[in-house]
From Swiss-Prot:
This is Leucine-rich repeat transmembrane neuronal protein 1. Residues 448-521 are cytoplasmic. SUPFAM superfamilies: L domain-like. It comes from Bos taurus. LRR repeats lie at residues 64-87, 89-111, 112-135, 136-159, 161-183, 184-207, 209-231, 233-255, 256-278, 280-302.
Amino acid sequence: MDFLLLGLCLHWLLRRPSGVVLCLLGACFQMLPAAPSGCPQLCRCEGRLLYCEALNLTEAPHNLSGLLGLSLRYNSLSELRAGQFTGLMQLTWLYLDHNHICSVQGDAFQKLRRVKELTLSSNQITQLANTTFRPMPNLRSVDLSYNKLQALAPDLFHGLRKLTTLHMRANAIQFVPVRIFQDCRSLKFLDIGYNQLKSLARNSFAGLFKLTELHLEHNDLVKVNFAHFPRLISLHSLCLRRNKVAIVVSSLDWVWNLEKMDLSGNEIEYMEPHVFETVPHLQSLQLDSNRLTYVEPRILNSWKSLTSITLAGNLWDCGRNVCALASWLSNFQGRYDGNLQCASPEYAQGEDVLDAVYAFHLCEEGAEPTSGHLLSAVTNRSDLGFPAGPATTLADDREGQPDSTPEPVTVALPGEHAENAVQIHKVVTGTMALIFSFLIVVLVLYVSWKCFPASLRQLRQCFVTQRRKQKQKQTMHQMAAMSAQEYYVDYKPNHIEGALVIINEYGSCTCHQQPARECEV
């Protein structure tokens, strides 16, 4: 069909006057994409891509057209003026990072409708007008990190329905306007970390139905309310580490699909008992380096899907309230840091939480109740693998409140059987170590005998020679001791034919020893 239409057009053109044909051909050539102009000096051209990087440029090259990509990074640009890129209507990406840009006029990106990626990071931009990104409705990625932005215009991201990635890390942003991301329905990654946020509005993140990862670390937030993240149904990762959060609450009863939450390095002292019931699919939780002293049993019961948790660096109170946490850790099948140290009372400071529970018998029957919790004995400890013996159960004493009453938590204490098992384990381990050492020595000797037989023969001869020398020395010492005794020895040689009176094992002789006599001089 296309060839048929082309043939009809050619046939029609051939019947027309030559002037009309030339005009039509000129119009067609004008509609074709313009080829890129000559490559500017010191720049690098790759087809329709232009790289003018690290050239100390103070303004963008002129008379550019037909480009698909332009990189002006690592230069000295200080301002983006209105209509500066009007000749680049086919541009799809623009890199302006690592310059000295401090001013961006509202219509600086006019006629750049096809741009999908814009990088303005590592500059000195202090503000952006509402109309800055209006000419670029096809943007997929915007990087504004490492600038000096202090405030965001309420409609800065209006109309960016295709935006998927937004970086605003390391600025000086103090507040996120309400519904500023309302039109960013395709946004999946948002980074506002390393700013100066002190609080969040309830609808700051409204409209982000496809957001999967949100970074708010290293800000100045003092309170986290899960109601600030309404209907983020696709959110899987939330990073809030290194803020100043003291309490974590949830004022809305709704469930979301969060799988990873980082609250480490804050100042958390209190968490509402029901706060984690809104995230039933949570798998990874970081709570290390906070000010927690204990964890409510209801919170522990809501950590059913966790596979990884960090709790070190908190101010754990190893009193009777620690029993619930100790029981939960004993049954936890996932990964945890295992460095939970007691901060109080004084006699348990520096001790591991689980060791303190067992060593100081913190959860035994007869302990006094504290903080509205009651300790009672339980005889069944098969779940923890210990023999039947004393144990304790932690239960909330509030009645008539089914939503806030936790399930009983059992803490098992090891008895004599457990101590005997530990001793047996030590003995077996020591025996195995000795056997292993002996086998290693035998193996070394065998390998040496196989690989260096001559050396072993020489070594054995040396040992034999040393033994002979030692025996000779002993014999000489004995003879010297015998010669020192003053004995009168009388001997009579045998004059038998063939007998020789020769000493030193060459003949035979007979000796008669007479009693010792005193001689007068």
